[in-house]
Regions:
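Acidic, proline/glycine-enriched N-terminal capping motif
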Residues: 1-59
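Short glycine-/aliphatic-rich beta-strand segments at the starts of folded cytosolic domains
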Residues: 19-34, 108-126
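Short helix/loop capping segments that flank catalytic or ligand/cofactor-binding pockets
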Residues: 38-39, 84, 125-126
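A glycine-rich, hydrophobic loop/mini-helix early in the fold
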Residues: 42-75, 82-97
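Helix N-cap motif at beta-to-alpha junctions
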Residues: 77-82, 120-122
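A short secondary-structure junction signal
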Residues: 92, 125-128
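Conserved short beta-strand edge segments in small beta-sheet-based binding/regulatory domains
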Residues: 100-109
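Single conserved hydrophobic/aromatic residue that forms the stacking wall/gate
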Residues: 131-140
Length: 140
C-alpha cells in the first residue's frame, strides 16, 4: 500500500545543481524458484523475467530487473497516482503467488526515493568519496 508523502514539492537549486524528487513508481520485489512461479508471473505480467545476471526485460507498462537467481524487482513505467492507495497487480500477484506458496511478493514502493539531479558539475559530485562508516576517532 502506498503511503507516499513527498519530501519536497519543489526543485532545489544550489550553485548550479538542481535536485528534484521524481514522482514515485510502483516497485514490487518478487522471489521464487518453482516452474509454476515463472509460469504464473509470465501470465500475469505478460512478460518473461530475466534469467541472466544484471539484465532486465521491458514491456509497455512494466520493467523487470534481475537482482539474484531467484529475485527480481518489478517497476511500473508509469508514475503512481497520488489519489490511489491500491495496486491491482500487487493484489493479483499476492493471491496467485504468495497465497499459493509459489514465491513471495513484497511491495517496496515506499522504501525508495528517486531524485533527478542535473547541473554542469554532476560528474564531479558523483566522483567524490563519501565516507559512511564511523571513524575510530569518532569513538566507535
Amino acid at each position: 500500500m502506498l503511503n507516499y508523502k513527498t519530501a519536497t514539492n519543489e526543485e532545489i537549486n544550489y550553485n548550479g545543481i538542481v535536485v528534484k524528487e521524481i514522482s514515485p513508481t510502483m516497485k514490487l520485489n518478487l522471489r521464487g524458484k518453482k516452474r509454476e512461479f515463472f509460469t504464473n508471473i509470465g501470465k500475469n505480467l505478460n512478460m518473461l523475467l530475466p534469467t541472466e545476471a544484471n539484465t532486465s526485460t521491458i514491456s509497455d507498462k512494466l520493467t523487470a530487473i534481475w537482482l539474484s537467481p531467484d529475485e527480481w524487482m518489478i517497476v511500473t513505467n508509469d508514475e503512481v497516482k497520488k489519489d490511489t492507495n491500491e495496486y491491482q497487480l500487487n493484489e493479483i500477484l499476492f493471491n496467485d503467488i504468495s497465497k499459493s506458496s509459489l514465491g513471495a511478493i513484497i511491495d517496496v514502493t515506499d522504501q525508495f526515493v528517486q531524485l533527478e539531479i542535473k547541473g554542469k558539475n554532476i560528474y564531479e559530485i558523483f566522483s567524490c568519496l563519501l565516507y559512511t562508516s564511523p571513524s575510530p576517532r569518532d569513538g566507535w
